């Protein structure tokens, strides 16, 4: 890495030398050939950990569907995950687009432009594959586990559809005449008939393998009706009653949140 030393001059003629280190990031594409030895960023542990094993099994299946997982070679949350929109695990119609199901840069990796680098790599790859553009889920204001709308807007994305619960579909077309992606009708008005707590989730997020059973146990201990529906195919996910399928919690039919629950958060929710 390149290092630069500058001198700052203050009014009292004090001087202070500050070392600025310019960071360069190296990325690697995770494939079936190297997945067993590579970490998957958001769940860094050994392959026997339930969070790691469930996510890696899901990834292996999705690689056959065209999924790309590009990540930093360093340990931590710095990666992008995308696949052809026809194979996305969400109720969207976006033929010819590439769907980004996760773009996450966190901790010490934030503020260095790595998110932009990952997105640029996705754009270049998608153009080379003849895609019409990119699409991704977000919202009007920043929400947990969704891309920052300010960042998306800065990169040229625009809102092309919105569900009743405020979840938005954003797109970045590569041609002016590209068709607009849209939510399927089942996702526009997130509502279900079942009473009590109902969770729709997939194995796309590794934390689900650990925390869904924990929340189920908390619900049992507190005599609360809780049903967990594990979407196990793209067809099930593409017809789910929610634009977000990675984690969508309902209560008495109404959509509550996409924020993942652990025992502490769920108990806090029950106390309201």
Model regions: which residues?
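Conserved acetyl-CoA-binding loop-helix of GNAT-fold acetyltransferases
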Residues: 105, 111-126
């Amino acid at each position: 890495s390149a290092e630069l030393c500058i001198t700052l001059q203050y009014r009292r003629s004090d001087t202070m030398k500050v070392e600025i280190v310019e960071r360069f990031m190296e990325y690697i594409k995770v494939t079936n050939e190297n997945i067993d030895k590579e970490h998957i960023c958001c769940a860094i542990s050994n392959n026997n950990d339930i969070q790691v094993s469930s996510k890696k099994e899901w990834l292996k299946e999705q690689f056959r569907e065209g999924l790309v997982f590009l990540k930093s070679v360093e340990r931590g949350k710095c990666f992008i995950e995308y696949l052809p929109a026809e194979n996305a695990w969400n109720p969207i119609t976006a033929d010819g687009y590439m769907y980004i199901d996760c773009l996450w840069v966190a901790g010490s990796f934030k503020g260095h432009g790595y998110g932009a680098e990952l997105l640029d790599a996705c754009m270049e790859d998608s153009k080379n594959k003849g895609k019409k553009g990119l699409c991704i889920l977000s919202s009007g204001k920043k929400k947990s586990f969704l891309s920052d709308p300010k960042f998306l807007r800065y990169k040229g994305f625009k809102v092309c559809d919105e569900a009743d619960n405020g979840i938005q579909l954003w797109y970045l077309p590569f041609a002016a005449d590209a068709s607009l992606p849209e939510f399927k009708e089942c996702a526009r008005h997130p509502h279900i008939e079942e009473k009590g707590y109902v969770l729709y989730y997939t194995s796309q997020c590794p934390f689900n393998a650990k925390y869904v059973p924990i929340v189920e146990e908390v619900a049992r201990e507190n005599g609360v009706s809780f049903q967990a529906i594990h979407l196990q195919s793209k067809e099930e996910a593409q017809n789910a009653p929610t634009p977000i399928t990675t984690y969508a919690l309902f209560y008495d039919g109404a959509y509550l949140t996409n924020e993942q629950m652990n025992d502490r958060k769920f108990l806090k929710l029950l106390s309201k």
